[in-house]
Each structure stands twice: as structure tokens, then as C-alpha cells.
Amino acid sequence: MTAQLKDKLIQQALERRLRHAAQSDSAPLSLVSGFGATDKIPEQHYRFHLHPGYQQIRIMNDGAARLGIGNPFFKLHEGTAANTTEIGGKSYINYASYNYLGLSGHPAVIAAAKAAIDQYGTSVSASRLVSGERPVHRQLEQALARVYGVDDAITFVSGHATNVTTIGYLFGPKDLVLHDEFVHNSALQGIQLSGARRLSFPHNDWQALDNILTEQRRHFDRVLIVLEGIYSMDGDFPDLPRFVEIKRRHFAFLMVDEAHSFGVMGKNGLGIREHFGLSGNDVDIWMGTLSKALAGCGGYIAGESALVEHLKFLAPGFLYSVGMPPPV
């Protein structure tokens, strides 16, 4: 089965490239655009230390050094992420972590992680499709599905990769993705991977979204709307019922990233769905991470069976990745 799936994915990729090439009006690609076969290749094209990104970092660091400003990044924190942290033996109030419920370092969580290592080891050593499936994976996914009141859920080894592979796989060049202007980088990377048309709307402005859909919906096959439960850099949240009504009226999919709202919003901490009293089926794609309130690592997608089954068998970021470590 695995070989067949790989062959199918490769064939689909080749077909997409052939279609793209057939539709392109560009001239044939030369070996190195702008240079003849005997011309010398500029050094910045094959040296990492001349890469524009690295040069930008050097300029920033040199400027900070001249101003006597130390590098605030990659500080070595000692111990568990909590309301305080230690750096270089000195205690500080910690505003930089997202262990929202204090579960990272909780005795019960530590004990469960140790028990999982004793029973299953530190790695499942395979993708879940092949031989990496363990009872703890399905227990976690079924628990997430119950919390959201939906059919099923799927977990990924990376929160960032969850958005990238889900959006990147489900949507394509004939589709449109509309997103709040403040959505996370992972959603933007997923949109870029998909090849879909991307349009942003002003932060939390459901009326602007409605206007865009009124003008643009008929020009695309599938349309995805991407929001966040809580916007981590601003601390605010969308009027989700308004967005649900809009997506229904325009026959679009709605995806909500609950990385920072799950465990924080709602009477019982069950997220923005509980806060507004919505049904799980009001949102097509519930996304979240396991590294914030849930004190682990990775991400998840929750929704109807057709969505989850689809991702399990065909989403590259799940199919070709190792299953989550049992202690996580």
C-alpha cells in the first residue's frame, strides 16, 4: 500500500508540473538565467555567507553591537518553563513562554510520559501508516475529537507543519485562501505551497471578508477562510459566529487555528468554540498545537471523518513523517 501511495503522489506531482508547463507562456529555461555557458557564476550564488538572509543578520548584529545592545535570542533557560525562569543562575519573571496551564513539569504529566517510555520507548521509529501506530496516538486523537464534538482528529509531529501540510495539500491553483492579516507564518507557508490565490483582509474585519467573497467567490473552485482563536501577538479574537455565517453563505471552508485559544478561552478552557457556544461542525477545520496549554509538542486537525481520513493517507507532512513520540 505504501509503495502504491508514493507512486500515486509522485504521479500527481508530475501531472501538475506538466499542466503548469503546458500553460506557461515563458521561454525555455536556460541553465543559469542571464549567463552564458562559459560565464563565471557570481560568488553570492553559491556561498552561504553571501546569502542575503545571512547578510541581513550580520548587519543587525553588528548594529546592535555598536550600540552596546546584547543579543536577546537563544538565551539558555535552566529548568522548566514556568511563571519564572533562570538564566545564568539568575531568576526572572517569564513572559516569553506559553505553558499556559502549568502542565509542563506537572507531576502527573511527567509520570505519564515516563510510563509511555517504559511501554513504547522514546520513538515509534516509523511513520504511522507503516508501523508507527500506537494506542496512545488514537487515544489522544479520539479525546481531541470528543472535545470539539466532531468525528475524528489527526496529530502531527510539528505544529507549524500541521498548517503547512494541511493547507498545502488540500488546496491548489484553482482555489482561493482568504486570511486575517495577522495569521501565523505557518498558514502563509501552507498557502504558498498550495499555489492557491492568497488574499488577506483587515484584522478581525468580517465585513471586509464578506465584501471580498461577494466579488471573488465565483472565480474559484474551493475557498478557504483562515482565522485564529486568539492572535498571539495581539491577544484578541474574532467574532467567530459572524465568520461562520459568512462562510456558509458563500459556500467556503472555515479553518480556525486554536494554538493559543485552546486551554485558555471558554468556561472550561475548551477554546473559542466553547466561548461562543458553537457546534463543532460550525467550523470545517479545527487546528491546534500540543505545545502550548497541552504542554507537549506537535499539532492536530479535528473535523469530519472525510477530512481526517483524507489527511491520514495523502497529506505528505503526515504520511512521510515519523509518528509522534509516545511520551509526547
Question: Where is each model-derived feature located?
Answer:
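N-terminal "arm"/small-domain region of PLP-dependent enzymes with the aminotransferase-like
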Residues: 5-122, 252
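Conserved N-terminal alpha-helix of the aminotransferase class I/II PLP-enzyme fold
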Residues: 111, 115-158
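Short, structured coil segments at secondary-structure junctions
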Residues: 149, 173, 194-195, 250
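Conserved PLP-anchoring active-site segment centered on the Schiff-base-forming lysine
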Residues: 166-185
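Active-site-proximal loop->helix
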Residues: 169, 186-195
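Active-site phosphate-binding strand-loop segment of PLP-dependent enzymes
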Residues: 199, 203-256
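Active-site C-terminal subdomain of aminotransferase-like
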Residues: 250-253, 260, 265-328
